[in-house]
Amino acid sequence: MPLVPPHVASLTPYVPGKPIEEVEREYGVSNVAKLASNENALGPSPLALAAAREACAKVHLYPDGSAYLLRNAIAAKLGVPPEEVMVGNGSNELIELLVRTFVLDGEEVLTSAQSFVAYKLAAHEHGRTLVEAPMKGRFHYDLDALRKLLSRRTKLVFLANPDNPTGTWFTEAELTPFLDAVPKDTLVVLDEAYVEYVDAPGFQDGLALRRKYPNVVVLRTFSKIYGLAGMRLGYGLARPEVVEYVDRVRPPFNTNLVAQAAGAAALGDSAHVAKSRALVLEERPFLAKGLAALGAIVVPSQGNFVLADFPGRTGKDLFEALLREGVIARPVAGYGFPSALRITVGLRRENERCLAALGRILGA
């Protein structure tokens, strides 16, 4: 008898970005610029830090299993009823919970090839069938192709807007015909981890769409613009029936006490959010222009990162060369982009350091 089912034995574990401490140990460098994991270059809100410190005095107690205060803070911030809010140990957990809760054996999960790998992992972890539509022009969601793959077996659809790792996005005019074609008992999950960085015309977030399409679920995170990646905290918005079923399946204390306090406080610091957004809107074009000057094909992005393709080069080699320079980027060969790097938008000095290092590497 095998130790694990075939669908588990065939899994390839997710490989996160290298930690700063590991790079310092391996390469003997200091002051490493981590531009690999799309974290907030400004760090967390001071209000969130203060709330976290205060909450640390209570860590001998279990957290509120319902995350009542956090759920209500999210609801108040977004103008939705609290019963439409669910929280998770990162939005990744909510992706897994949605698959576990709603997709039966023989039903399908539909998404775009080369989009966020967590959708594929969640389907495979639970032994569910994954159906992928090819991207359009290498880097863009093809909603027409996705629509043609809809079937009576489609139970969940995952759409990242903006996408990770490409940074591309789709407009309301592109999305609405797709939503009109989706069966009402199929859930469409709009993953909006980077929505706060969007400034593109024609973009429509999922909050308004939920009013017209009750089968839409919106996922967001505290890891990006709120700067709480280490806390592992995300949330979802869905009709109450969906939230209730997810609550039945999730672990009883899936978000910790400190994270709940920090998340609620972060929501109240609109100045820090505005500052974080302004940094990205200023530095994103600076980084993109610098990469293009080095010969990269830079994919227009609405996230806090850019995807840069270096034809004739290998992303893995560039990644390792950057590590020796004290810069951590993200190779994306696993997404089907073997000559590309995904680079987080950092502080100006970090972006300049990355560009200078790449200039030396490419010119060698």
UniProtKB/Swiss-Prot annotation:
One of its GO terms (biological process) is L-histidine biosynthetic process. It is an enzyme of class 2 (transferase). Its cofactor is pyridoxal 5'-phosphate. Pfam families: Aminotran_1_2. Pathway: Amino-acid biosynthesis; L-histidine biosynthesis; L-histidine from 5-phospho-alpha-D-ribose 1-diphosphate: step 7/9. The modification N6-(pyridoxal phosphate)lysine is found at residue 224. Its EC number is 2.6.1.9. InterPro entries: Aminotransferase_I/II_large, HisP_aminotrans, HistidinolP_aminotransfase, PyrdxlP-dep_Trfase, PyrdxlP-dep_Trfase_major, PyrdxlP-dep_Trfase_small. Belongs to the class-II pyridoxal-phosphate-dependent aminotransferase family. Histidinol-phosphate aminotransferase subfamily. This is Histidinol-phosphate aminotransferase. The gene is hisC.
